[in-house]
Amino acid sequence: LLNGFCTSEQPLTRSENGVIFGSLAAAAKAYPELVERYYNQLAESQGDAVSALNTVFAQDGAFVYVPQGVWAERPFVISFSYYSEGESLAGFARNLFVFESGSRAQVVIENRSASDETYFDCQVREVFAAEDARADIVELFRLNGRSSIVSGSFTEQQASSRVHTLSVGLEGRLIRGDQHVALKGRGAENHTDGLMLSGAGQHIDFTTDIWHISRDCTSYEVFK
């Protein structure tokens, strides 16, 4: 995605096993009932000013849907590139990941600057993990020294689900992430980890909010 918009000639794909991957805007047109069932359900109820701002301006982003019992063979790779010539820009990407019961998937997200201009991105991600779903999400930040990103991640997990999120911040003037997790089903397990390698003049800040709503849930958290 370039500046928050999908530029591919084929913005959305659906495999034989029902997996849907690609542009959120394209998914909303092709599968409106599916997207409407989940879109903004978490950000609206749990969100803050960041999610509210994104909801107002968001037009596109990434969409991942893995049906019940499907094990995705390859990771879903999502690249957000930020590019401008001679002017400062802002983007508002919105991402929606849905993992149905018994599914397995891996998602790799890259946020990178493709020019030396100033860029500001306000990004929101909603993740739904149904019963016994397994999802690993790795997010990498590589921005230039003039660009910033603020993001909100909202995850809802049902019984016996497992979600592992790893955020790696390498470069960027400001990288701020708020991660909200709701463990709503018995036996749900969450891992929220981060590795921040900041230099002079850089600020990286992550906050986490993990709610053990159901009993016998487990959460682990490591940030360095």
Can you say where each PLM-predicted feature lies in the sequence?
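Conserved beta-strand/loop scaffold segments within soluble protein domains that form the structured core
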Residues: N3, T7-K224
